[in-house]
């Protein structure tokens, strides 16, 4: 669905095809049991289940399309300072004190949405007490266009295939204390821990990027539409990024 949206708004055409990676299979298993489930594109008569695209590439394609659109005026790097919602229109004050008016304001400004706060939309909040460690790794064995995720006792670990047959993007969700320990490890120590946690499924793993971490929280805004305002994407809801589906669910 998210790929179709990018096609429909003209952003997909700006993606470098050399950086796209289709995935034809998905495998999910539990480390402490025999539980396992697999999905295949062939089961639904498709060439692929979807594509793995780097976040930076998607941002660039969206930005390029916005720059090329005659229907969009970019006001950067200005930010919203205040919103006042009237019966007929919304009054917007930017951080340089310039003002705009609009009949509808759509907040697509992420989990910590300023638009949501200014609209006083209540939200349900849940802290998973976990951090997600993300990085790019090189694997000894090729990923064969398969997305994989293992559930470990301390949290799930996903390997998402990238354009190089031996490169994967990892999302390793761990309890906060365990994540802190993993981030303190040397690259060599981290590689060993990662390889073991993934049951050596793709052989020895090697970091080829810096490790980054972010807190995992569930947010669900109880109201998405109000007087002259609406919120979408992560501004409306965020969930645990299982199997790399967080962005897809945010878009759809």
Model-derived features with residue positions:
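Glycine-rich FAD cofactor-binding loop and adjacent beta-loop-alpha segment at the N-terminus
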Residues: 1-23
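Pyridoxal 5′-phosphate
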Residues: 85-89, 143, 250
């Amino acid at each position: 669905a998210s790929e179709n949206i990018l096609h429909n708004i003209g952003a997909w055409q700006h993606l470098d095809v050399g950086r796209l990676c289709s995935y034809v299979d998905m495998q999910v298993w539990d480390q402490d049991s025999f539980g396992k489930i697999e999905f295949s594109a062939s089961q639904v008569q498709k060439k692929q289940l979807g594509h793995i695209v780097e976040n930076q590439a998607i941002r660039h394609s969206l930005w390029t399309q916005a720059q090329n659109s005659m229907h969009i005026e970019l006001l950067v790097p200005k930010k919203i300072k205040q919103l006042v919602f009237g019966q007929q229109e919304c009054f917007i004050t930017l951080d340089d004190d310039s003002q705009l008016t609009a009949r509808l304001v759509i907040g697509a400004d992420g989990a910590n949405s300023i638009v949501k706060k200014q609209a006083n939309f209540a939200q349900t909040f849940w802290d998973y007490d976990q951090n997600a460690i993300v990085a790019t790794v090189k694997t000894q064995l090729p990923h064969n266009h398969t997305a994989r995720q293992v559930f470990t006792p301390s949290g799930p670990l996903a390997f998402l295939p990238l354009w190089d047959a031996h490169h994967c993007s990892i999302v390793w969700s761990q309890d906060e204390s365990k994540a802190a320990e993993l981030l303190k490890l040397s690259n060599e120590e981290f590689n060993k821990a990662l390889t073991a946690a993934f049951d050596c499924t793709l052989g020895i793993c090697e970091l080829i990027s810096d490790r980054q971490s972010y807190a995992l929280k569930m947010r669900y805004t109880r109201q998405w539409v109000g007087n002259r305002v609406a919120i979408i994407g992560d501004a409306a809801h965020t969930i645990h990024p299982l199997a790399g589906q967080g962005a897809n669910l945010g878009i759809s």
